């Protein structure tokens, strides 16, 4: 399980050191893809395979299903960590998430997310005020 928030930097070659606490969970190979809310999602291979099966089961006759799977899979890249624990992020993914030098890596249960520091700060500021309301509106959820 992934959890926590870490501040990191991306070098001029598009490489980022993956937080040590996330490396074992991601494994030697993992997938980075376009996520929601202008961030990147990172999945261990076993999680990616489960998502792949669910998305393959969506009906091709549904326009939204086709659009989502195209967007999700076309942005996906298999990644490996180098000996220093860095991942090389594809330029198309860097552009999508507006990732520059400063970034935030967060753990979200079965995945990690990579955010532009600026976008993450804006997002958390917007969500902090409505966190209790969001929790209240989630059906069948209690903490």
Swiss-Prot record:
Disruption phenotype: No visible phenotype.
Keywords: Cytoplasm, DNA-binding, Repeat, Transcription, Transcription regulation
Coiled-coil ranges per UniProt: none
PROSITE patterns membership: SPOVT_ABRB (PS51740)
GO BP annotations, alphabetical order: negative regulation of DNA-templated transcription initiation
A GO cellular-component term linked to this record: cytoplasm
SpoVT-AbrB domain: residues covered: 5-47, 76-119
SUPFAM superfamilies linked: AbrB/MazE/MraZ-like (SSF89447)
UniProt subunit comment: Forms oligomers.
Protein's name according to its UniProt entry: Transcriptional regulator MraZ
């Amino acid at each position: 399980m992934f959890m926590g928030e870490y501040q990191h930097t991306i070098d001029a070659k598009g490489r980022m050191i993956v937080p040590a606490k996330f490396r074992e969970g991601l494994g030697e190979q993992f997938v980075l893809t376009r996520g929601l809310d202008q961030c990147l999602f990172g999945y261990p291979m076993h999680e990616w395979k489960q998502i792949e099966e669910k998305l393959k089961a969506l009906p091709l006759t549904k326009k939204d299903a086709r659009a989502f799977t195209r967007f999700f899979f076309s942005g996906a890249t298999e990644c490996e960590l180098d000996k220093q624990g860095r991942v090389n992020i594809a330029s198309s993914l860097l552009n999508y998430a507006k990732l520059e030098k400063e970034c935030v890596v967060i753990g979200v249960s079965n995945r990690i997310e990579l955010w532009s520091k600026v976008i993450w700060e804006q997002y958390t500021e917007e969500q902090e005020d409505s966190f209790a309301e969001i929790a209240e509106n989630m059906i069948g959820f209690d903490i």
